[in-house]
Amino acid sequence: MKPTLLPCSLLRAAGLGAVAVGLFATSPSAGAAASAKRPNVLLIFADDLRTELGCYGVAGIKTPSIDALARRSVRFDRAYVQFPLCNPSRASLLTGRYPTATGVLGNTEFLGSRHPDWDTLPMYFRKHGYATLRTGKIFHGGYDDTDAWVEGGEPRPLGNADRKGSSQDPKRSDSIVVLEGDGESHADYKSATRAIEYLRKYGRSEQPFLVACGFSKPHSPPTAPRKMFDLYDVEKIPLPADFAPHPTVPKGFPERSVPARNGDLFIGREASIREAREMKRAYWAAVSFVDAQVGRVMAALGELGLRDNTIVVFWGDHGYHLGEKGKWSKHGSLWQVGLAVPYMISAPGVSADGQACPRVVECMSMYPTLVDLCGLPAISGHQTPSITPLLRQPAAPWDRPAISVSYSQRTLGRSVRTERWHYADWDEGRAGAMLIDTEKDPAELRNLAADPNLAAVVSEMRRHLRLLPAVGSRP
């Protein structure tokens, strides 16, 4: 049924052979064949998903399948993407490099044309004997690493070139899409179905697989079956304490900290409290729809007897404002809600399942961590270490900061987080800076950057930013 629209080259894949199993250990009950091969990998990505999940402590939202996955994973409670936008974030994740090194600072740049010699995560696994299989959104739409996949690769992107930017139509930005039935007609349902087909086809093989399943929701317009909307009473949908009808810079913060125009929802107009609740309800429904698809894929993984030899990673590609500071998008946000994402890793025999890791981590750690877990040769060029030690001991000491950037109006924004502090600046501080004590001010409402008593903290945070390569530099 139609949805209801409501306003409101293989050459590069050749080469390196198989290697021995590394850190990963299968369960004693696993068969001889499963024990002999390297672990499988299942990647599950969601678009525009912030830590709006039951397992992350959000009361009222219904995410039973992802919550169940969390109970068999290490959940990273302070995981930060390296850019608050789809293309740059995914390019960073899939190369293990900062956005300033990839040169992808927006949704119109193609990673492949900038660094054709780099092995992305799926390409590296393919070169090392994995059947790499894609369904849904893994790289940014239209910018796939075509040759990295045995199956599922998109046609080579746009003649290997960048493309012109596009702007969202303000008249359609507030649309909410209601699906009938279970949403079988939607691309995300179909992506889950194809992932299940991959598991059935490749799960019996001696060749290990890497299945990458990417969901397009809850990206705008929020879309879900009617029954998902029915899970939530709009009158009980909570709004943030710093809600405002339009993007609003908090007192004492730089103007650039909150872009004046929303990029996804309520573009060019104010949001009433009622409209805000309706939109957040739709976002929650879309998250529940994604959760149902995760449940389908995980059920198949278990039914096929693959769970004990498969590393599962769940990740959201960046955060999202749902009214915080009057903002309804991710664009340009260096705030907690713009950069913090769900990040879970289940590695049977390695991960301390069911535990939460309180350490600050960078999401681009995924690539070196999977290489580590699967016993593949370490790859040069990665700009963050494997977080395997935190899978074994989630509370172990970890002093690596998390660095993120944004880029707008030819100005680079930089953010760095440590256990206690969050510092951000624009144009290296010439366009403003902010310092937040995240222990005392988790909502990020007070800017301490100008406090003379904290000058040493500011200096220390700026020293951390030296880890960030200059724009266009090569590792």
Regions found by a protein language model. Give the residues of each.
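Bacterial N-terminal signal peptides that target proteins for export
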Residues: K2-G17
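Formylglycine-dependent sulfatase
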Residues: A14, G22-A25, A30-D427, A431-M434, ...
